[in-house]
């Protein structure tokens, strides 16, 4: 093909006009040290704290230390294929997780990837895991209850929507059981539940998933699992991923969310491991100086918003030999709005849930209690505390006056009434009825060993014979004269039925 000179010059002009400078400037560095899930990278002069770095073989890292001549970052994947001299690129973004309706009913890891074998999660929404908590102006005071289904807690240590209530106790005292029962009790309440397992055994998480599925609770629950075999950085990120998923429902859909962190002791240990490997200066119990901020910025994201929606946080802390004055327990106690203390001694003596109401407290939940529960809970707490004090003195002497004996008898029945089996949460109206019976002396002529049986029978009897009164208990009037009279009539009527069956 012959081309004329003017055609050639025209083609060259066209090519010059079409030419685009497609140079991409990327901040790159070199790995100078790697090991124990941590890498030091030289040359990333513009790296930002918390930024994602791209390593070879699709491994990502997160910047934690910004030093004079290098950057210290934790790896969100295994370091087996990363060697000194590898090229690392800045990404200009921070860790993000998928959020949205598609997450409900799924078990995901700390980065939001499914681990339940049910296929990929399809969602268009992603959110950064670290965001600023809602400000004071956006919040409103806690005024709605979140029912745990436990009589001892809903009456004496009530929890409100938007509250942060710590569950604290030694290992094997029923902390996780209390959290799981609270999730089961949210059925039909239009509450999204998120359970974050930090450093738990995979077998334990599988057991929890099975229990929630059995009770149809996975229909409104997301499980975020960073197991004991996972890397410390993933255990560190897991609670922030969980609360990010919760914030989507609170902010975008104005829904109420319940989030459980099980447990923050292991979260602090994971952060300590990362910090020590990064050579950050250790402080008390070898934790870094910012371990308080680690938990405060997480728990401050729980809120009740004026625009609607809330996040209620139930962090769990494991104590050693009941020592609540250790570093991490005192930190989290000072951040939260109260704590439920579960005592190993009570647990072993058969009082379950093993709540110690003496040092358990809810600072803001009282204003969220329903009217009828508030009325029965007042005398209950006082009488229970008096009974515990009297019982400790009564064991030293046998010559007790009649009034003391009556108080002890009433206290024994209150203790028995507050016992509850696992996976057996109770409706608030049923709780009010049985606590009313206990605090007003209706159970004094029932043997202590028969109390639990009497309780079950009374609830069934009331639901069958007095259904309209049971619905009024949750109303604005609370324990009106009409309800109180109906309660007394109902209890006396059932006592006659029960006495014939015993």
Swiss-Prot record:
Domain of life according to the entry: Bacteria
GO molecular function: ADP binding; ATP binding; proton-transporting ATP synthase activity, rotational mechanism; sodium-transporting ATPase activity, rotational mechanism
Keyword list, A-Z: ATP synthesis, ATP-binding, Cell membrane, CF(1), Ion transport, Membrane, Nucleotide-binding, Sodium, Sodium transport, Translocase, Transport
Annotated site, Required for activity, chain positions: 360
Top-tier EC class: translocase
Catalytic activity: 4 Na(+)(in) + ATP + H2O = 4 Na(+)(out) + ADP + phosphate + H(+)
Organism, as annotated: Acetobacterium woodii (strain ATCC 29683 / DSM 1030 / JCM 2381 / KCTC 1655 / WB1)
EC number: 7.2.2.1
Pfam families associated with the record: ATP-synt_ab (PF00006), ATP-synt_ab_C (PF00306), ATP-synt_ab_N (PF02874)
Record protein name field: ATP synthase subunit alpha, sodium ion specific
Matches recorded under PROSITE patterns: ATPASE_ALPHA_BETA (PS00152)
Family note: Belongs to the ATPase alpha/beta chains family.
Entry binding sites for ATP: 169-176
Regulation of its function: Inhibited by nitrate.
Function: Produces ATP from ADP in the presence of a sodium ion gradient across the membrane. The alpha chain is a regulatory subunit.
SS bonds (residue pairs): none
């Amino acid at each position: 093909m012959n081309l004329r000179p003017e055609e050639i010059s025209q083609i060259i002009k066209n090519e010059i006009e079409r030419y685009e400078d497609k140079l991409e400037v990327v901040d790159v560095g070199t790995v100078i040290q790697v090991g124990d899930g941590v890498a030091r990278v030289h040359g990333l002069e513009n790296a930002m704290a918390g930024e994602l770095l791209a390593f070879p073989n699709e491994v990502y890292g997160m910047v934690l230390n910004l030093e004079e001549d290098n950057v210290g970052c934790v790896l969100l994947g295994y370091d087996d294929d990363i060697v000194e001299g590898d090229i690392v690129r800045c990404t200009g973004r921070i860790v993000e997780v998928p959020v949205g309706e598609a997450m409900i009913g799924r078990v995901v890891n700390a980065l939001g990837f499914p681990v339940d074998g049910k296929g990929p999660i399809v969602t268009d929404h992603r959110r950064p895991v670290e965001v600023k908590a809602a400000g004071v102006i956006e919040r409103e005071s806690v005024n709605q209850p979140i029912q745990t289904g436990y009589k001892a807690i809903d009456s004496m240590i009530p929890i409100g929507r938007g509250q942060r209530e710590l569950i604290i106790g030694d290992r094997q005292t029923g902390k996780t059981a209390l959290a799981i029962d609270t999730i089961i009790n949210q059925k039909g309440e239009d509450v999204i539940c998120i359970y974050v397992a930090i450093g738990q055994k995979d077998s334990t998480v599988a057991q929890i998933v099975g229990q929630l599925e059995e009770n149809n609770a996975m229909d409104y629950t997301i499980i975020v699992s960073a197991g004991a075999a996972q890397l410390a950085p993933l255990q560190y990120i897991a609670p922030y991923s969980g609360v990010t998923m919760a914030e989507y429902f609170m902010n975008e859909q104005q829904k109420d969310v319940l989030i459980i962190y099980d447990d923050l002791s292991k979260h602090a240990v994971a952060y300590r491991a990362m910090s020590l490997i990064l050579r950050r200066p250790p402080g008390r119990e070898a934790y870094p100086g910012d371990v308080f901020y680690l938990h405060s910025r997480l728990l401050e994201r729980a809120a009740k918003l004026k625009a609607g929606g809330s996040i209620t946080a139930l962090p769990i802390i494991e104590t050693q030999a009941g020592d609540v004055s250790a570093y991490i327990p005192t930190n989290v106690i000072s951040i939260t709005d109260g704590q439920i203390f579960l005592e190993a001694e009570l647990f072993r003596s058969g009082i379950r849930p093993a709540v110690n109401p003496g040092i358990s407290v809810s600072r803001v939940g009282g204003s969220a209690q329903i009217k009828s529960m508030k009325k029965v809970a007042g005398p209950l707490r006082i009488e229970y505390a008096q009974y515990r004090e009297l019982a400790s003195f009564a064991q030293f002497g046998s010559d007790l006056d009649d009034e003391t004996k009556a108080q002890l008898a009433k206290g024994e029945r209150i203790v028995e009434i507050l016992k509850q089996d696992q996976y057996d949460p109770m409706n608030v109206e049923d709780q009010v009825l049985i606590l009313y019976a206990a605090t007003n002396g209706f159970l004094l002529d029932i043997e202590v060993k028969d109390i639990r049986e009497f309780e079950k029978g009374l609830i069934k009897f009331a639901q069958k014979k007095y259904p309209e009164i049971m619905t009024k208990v949750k109303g604005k009037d609370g324990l009106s004269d009409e309800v109180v009279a109906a309660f007394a009539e109902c209890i006396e009527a059932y006592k006659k039925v029960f006495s014939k069956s015993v």
